Amino acid sequence: MTEERRPDPVVPDLLARPYWIFDMDGTLTDPVHDFAAIRAALGVPEGSDILGYLDTLPEIESRRLHGLLDEIENELAGRAEASAGARRLVTALDRRGVRMGIVTRNTRQVALRVLEHIGVGSYFPAGSILGRHDALPKPEPDGILRLAASWGTTGRSAVMVGDYLFDLQCGRSAGALTVHVDRTRAFRWPQFTDLAVASLEELAELVEQGISRE
């Protein structure tokens, strides 16, 4: 029998925020992207941010490589699997009346396909999904701010859940509470993190415990 995790002091603050925004790849889904291979296929220097590099290229070349990136990500979409606890978490939040959205460095079209594929598409209307062509890519807070504005609120009413530094920086800059999901438990960016968990299963358990104590 596993020991119940003691509630984190930040959990009541998370539950008080009626808008939750998720990263998709590696957060709601298990990681499938081989970024080194993608960089090689696109000619992006090792260690460089893929989108940032493509945007520095001449327009015709940038457009061509963005198209190739779209093809790669469309192929990966068919292999996506829900991360542990993803369905449990979004179901618990939905029952609470939380409004949910996605801010991803993928495209909206791929995101819609992935979310349907992993069985959570009904929780995320198309208008609540912002991809790299809909807002400035993370770590810019633009995606969160745009979603919040469309909901008639601000980033300070939101929670941002993600697995990478850019997600946390994006959330912090927008005024959102940030949740870092890290399967390795390294938790490398505490300065940008309000709550750290190893999985969405763990986060779902904390949310359910918090609700039961209200």
Which role fits each region the language model picked out?
Residues 1-61:
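Active-site neighborhood of HAD-like aspartate-dependent phosphohydrolases
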Residues 1-18, 108, 114-214:
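Asp-based, Mg2+/Mn2+-dependent phosphohydrolase catalytic module
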Residues 23-24, 103, 161, 181:
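Short hydrophobic segments within beta-strands
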Residues 35, 50-51, 62, 66, ...:
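A general structural signal for well-ordered alpha-helical segments in protein cores
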Residues 35-42, 70-73, 111-114:
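Hydrophobic alpha-helical core bundles mediating ligand binding, dimerization, or RNAP-core interactions
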Residues 62-73, 123-128:
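Short, basic/glycine-rich phosphate-binding loops at helix/coil junctions
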Residues 75-102, 108-112, 141:
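Short, acidic loop-to-helix structural element flanking the phosphoryl-transfer center
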